[in-house]
Regions:
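ALDH superfamily catalytic-core signature
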Residues: 1-99, 162
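Conserved C-terminal structural/oligomerization subdomain of aldehyde/semialdehyde dehydrogenase
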Residues: 37, 66, 82, 89-205
């Protein structure tokens, strides 16, 4: 839940697409939705779980993504319409059975929408996960060492978090692939971005 709804989803590291293995899909989505329904929405001074979005355009984007997903056959499990406590508030929203070509799967939502889809095989979910123009971070949750090795090798993302949701810090080479930026911030690699490389060739005779 925190991987999606921290900072109301307005975070480049926020999980956009949730792929859950089919045998546990229904139970997982139900448990996830129950926790999301318990999240509070309100002004920041009231210490809510979900605060306002940055502007009206951000709220309109949430509405567009929800409407598009529902039009394509997704199920709305909670949220989905702007909150009545203020113009820029949108409640935490869960969508299930989202098709791969829905806007919420094709664009970065930057808002409190969690979109779910089931998968049947490793090849299936890897193809879907990598089918994106951006590749900043992927979150992998599994108890299988073999699957960890397979997915961390084949996921086309600059960072992969395994069985955790926090992946920031000064020692980390923060950055992505594809349209998620060039170079790295943080770590030795990040420092090298601010240096000039000089090659000297010669001898002392």
């Amino acid at each position: 839940v925190s991987a999606k709804f921290a900072t109301s989803g307005q975070d480049c590291l926020a999980a956009n697409r949730f792929y859950i293995e089919r045998p546990i899909y229904d139970a997982f989505v139900e448990a996830f939705t129950e926790k999301v329904r318990a999240l509070s929405v309100g002004p920041g001074l009231e210490d809510p779980d979900i605060g306002p979005l940055i502007n009206a355009r951000a709220v309109a984007k949430q509405e567009e993504h929800v409407a598009d997903a529902l039009k394509q056959g997704a199920r709305l499990l909670c949220g989905g319409t702007r909150a009545d406590i203020g113009a820029n508030f949108f409640p935490p929203t869960v969508l299930a059975d989202v098709p791969c070509d829905a806007l919420v799967f094709r664009e970065e939502t930057f808002g409190p929408i969690a979109a779910f889809s089931p998968f049947d095989s490793a090849d299936d979910v890897l193809q879907q996960a990598n089918d994106t123009e951006t590749g900043l971070v992927a979150y992998l949750h599994t108890q299988s060492p073999a699957r960890i090795a397979q997915f961390t090798r084949l996921l086309e993302f600059g960072m992969v978090a395994v069985n955790r949701t926090k992946i920031t810090g000064a020692p980390i080479p923060f950055g992505g692939t594809k349209q998620a930026g060039l170079g790295r911030e943080g770590s030795r690699m990040g420092m090298e971005e601010f240096t000039n490389v000089k090659y000297v060739c010669g001898d002392t005779h």
